[in-house]
Structure formats: structure tokens, C-alpha cells
Amino acid sequence: NGIEVVVPVKISKTLNGVQITLKADVLDKLVSSGVKRFIIDADRMADFGFTLDTLKKLNQQTSGNIVLKVKKITVTSVKAKAAIKKPPVYDISLWEVKNVKKTKLTNQKENWTSTERKAKKVKKTKLTNLWGKTISIAIPYTPKKNEQPGNLYAVFVNGKGKPQWITRSSYDADQKAVTFEFTKSGVYGVGYKAKKPVLTDINNH
């Protein structure tokens, strides 16, 4: 029950990445309106679901715009390649972006452009965690003929290239996607194991 807001984002087939901005005043409005679920449908890349609790926490902990960056990448480590045999693999990150102050331009130079006159100092901060909250992510995936959907999991690849099979990840036949809870910025993909893997709570890594 409650209000659900879905924002569709169309992505060109030629693009390997997307940057989606949730403005601070829009976040305020979502929280004050009591939206139970806010979903960013990033077309062929992934769906991102924010609960009201997550929206509230982001609103409490940040003062600028929230920027969601999704970039298609290729893993390079041998272990990561073994776990994620089939694309897509995404570098998913959340950022806070805000204008710290306006920069006053003096007349030391003639013919300032309008862009230069409006120049601002912008501060970008990568959100390394969500303060105990999560974002639900669904990565579209079509199982191969020899793959059992029950053996599909989301995989997190850490900074050293080590893959970690994510707790509470699974294939959702209705969404035709592998779903999991996102807790921190990083590299994510879809992995397959015929035998049940050792799942990891990436919050502790």
C-alpha cells in the first residue's frame, strides 16, 4: 500500500553508461509526500528501487543532489571472469553533488563568457555506504538453455578483483532479472554456479 513513483529513463543502445540526478528538492518532496517506493527504471541496464526508509536516510545525511552513476565495464581479474562469465557487468555508484560557493570573477580578463561569469565550485562526494539502508536492484538477464534460474546470483567484485556471491540475491522470473540489495558503491554482475555458492554479506567487507 501507499504511493509508488516510477521514473523511466530511456537509454540509447550506443551508450555504455548513464548518470541520473535526483535533485535535493525532489528528494525532500518524495519524503514529505510519504512515497513508499521510488523506482528508477534505467531501461535495458537495471531497475533501482528506493524504500521510504532509504529516501529518509539519504535526505537526513545529504544536502546536495544525489547522482546515480551506472557504467558498463569489463572485469579483468581471473577470479571475477570465472564468476561472471556473461555480461553485463556494471560499476554502480551513488554521489552527492552540491555547489559549495559561487566564484566571483574579477575583471582581470576581458570578454568573460556567460559560463565563466556563473562559475561555481562543485563538490562531489562518493557515498561509500547507505548508513545501514539498501537499494533494491534488478539486472535484466536471460538464462541460457543450460542454466537453471535457481543457480543465478548477483556477484560483487571488490577493489582487488575478488568476486563475492551476494546474500539474498536470486533470479526473479516475473522481472526476468537477477535481484539483490545494494549497500555500497562498486562493481556488480550476474554469476552462475551449478552448486550453491558460499554467499557473502558484503556489508562486512
Q: What residues fall within each predicted segment?
A:
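Proteolytic cleavage junctions
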Residues: 100-205
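Solvent-exposed, low-complexity segments and loops of surface/extracellular structural proteins
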Residues: 10-15, 23, 33, 83
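Self-processing/autoproteolytic domain segments and adjacent N-terminal interaction modules in large
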Residues: 28-130
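A generic structural signal for beta-strand entry/edge sites
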Residues: 2-4, 17, 35-37, 65, ...
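Low-complexity, acidic Ser/Thr/Pro-rich repeat tracts that form intrinsically disordered stalk/linker regions
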Residues: 1-11
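Short, T/G/N/S-enriched strand-turn elements that build extracellular solenoid repeat scaffolds
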Residues: 1, 18-30
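Short, solvent-exposed secondary-structure boundary motifs
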Residues: 20-22, 55-62, 157-163
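Helix N-terminus capping/helix-initiation residues
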Residues: 23-25, 49-51, 172
